[in-house]
């Protein structure tokens, strides 16, 4: 029997029908073996980061319970992105996208390998991630001991 972990996935989109796309992404994740979506934060309209000349984003976070490894969960996230029309590698790195699914946290695991870093390396810098994480779990603590609530106050 595989161990279940609480995982958090960042949701983002700034092209097309953003809300419908993010709703569909959550549905596809919920229908995936080894993944149970337990909560989804409020979706927030946010300004782009890193590449300003693009439409505003709709961002949120989904809380999952999963028995998938971090790598297997990331693979499923990338698969869902492809199913929803995302083509990685086109345009600027932080440019417009139909959908963006980021593995933010996977239990207490810390992973640093090619193509996968958990916790997400820019998690603590991004209010559009911290605010929905705090909404879903006001007591959430990162694997390094920092509390999301404290990061929001910084």
Task: Please describe what each predicted stretch is.
Residues 34, 49-57, 68-154:
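Flexible, gly/pro- and Lys/Arg-enriched active-site loops
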């Amino acid at each position: 029997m595989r161990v279940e972990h609480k995982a958090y996935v960042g949701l983002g989109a700034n092209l097309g029908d953003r809300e419908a796309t993010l709703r569909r992404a959550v549905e596809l994740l919920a229908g995936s073996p080894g993944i149970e979506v337990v909560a989804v934060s409020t979706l927030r309209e946010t300004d782009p980061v890193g590449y300003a000349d693009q439409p505003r984003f709709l961002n949120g976070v989904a809380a999952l319970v999963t028995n998938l490894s971090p790598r297997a969960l990331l693979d499923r996230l990338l698969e869902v992105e492809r199913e929803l029309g995302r083509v990685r590698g086109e345009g600027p790195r932080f440019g417009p996208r139909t959908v963006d699914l980021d593995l933010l946290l996977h239990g207490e695991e810390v992973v640093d390998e090619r193509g996968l870093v958990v916790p997400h390396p820019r998690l603590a810098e991004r209010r559009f991630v911290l605010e929905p994480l705090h909404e879903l779990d006001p007591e959430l603590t990162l694997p390094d001991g920092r509390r999301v609530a404290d990061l929001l106050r910084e």
